[in-house]
Amino acid sequence: RPVNVMGATKQIAERIILHLQEEYPNTSFGAVRFGNVLGSSGSVIPLFKRQLENGEPLTLTDQDVTRYFMTIPEAVQLILKASILDSFPGQVAMLDMGEPIKILDLARNLLRLSGRQFRMGENVIVTGLRPGEKMHEELAAPDETVHATEERRVFLVETPEEFSEIPYGLRVSLGNADGLALLDFLVAEFGAAENQPSALKELGATLTMSGSKMEQEA
């Protein structure tokens, strides 16, 4: 369940891929869902390592925040193993990443490995959750069904959503070279969500107002 624009665009990408399988059945299309890839650009461990090297406190958004992690080899294996599954075309695959990891525990272990003592409020500080950031990640939505495959750690996610309207809306926006309309379209689907973060609501409202202003000026 996306709560920010990045999550929304990822879900839209999944829908496009699955729609392509319906439109071009002679070609195999499928998508994979990643967890947080350790060591990748923007991930928490490179951030913590940089802060340690600079003598800075480790920053985390909340003491209770958790995340699922996978290594780069696991990410590669997920793509390769999913791609050879007979049941993969037209599906979304994800990896069994075990239990989510508490970021506070990750910070504590990195400090210990670097020979430093853990001192909350001194070398570890809490900055607060950012707009659109989740406390805990969900690998699958409540209305999705997860199925096992012949690959022990690879699962397929079945979603009840219909995909036909998404590609059509994207085609209209892209065909008109209208970036505002495209973003507005992406955000609008989540406008009715009760727990939608204010940042996403504000972006949707801003895009709508900007689009209306452009129409008036034209």
Language model features: what each stretch is:
Residues 15-218:
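Strand-loop microenvironment adjacent to phosphate/nucleotide-handling motifs in alpha/beta enzyme folds
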Residues 12:
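Active-site His/Glu-centered metal-binding helix of metallohydrolases
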Residues 6:
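Catalytic tyrosine of NAD(P)H-dependent dehydrogenase/reductases that use a Tyr as the general acid/base
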Residues 9:
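Active-site helix of classical SDR
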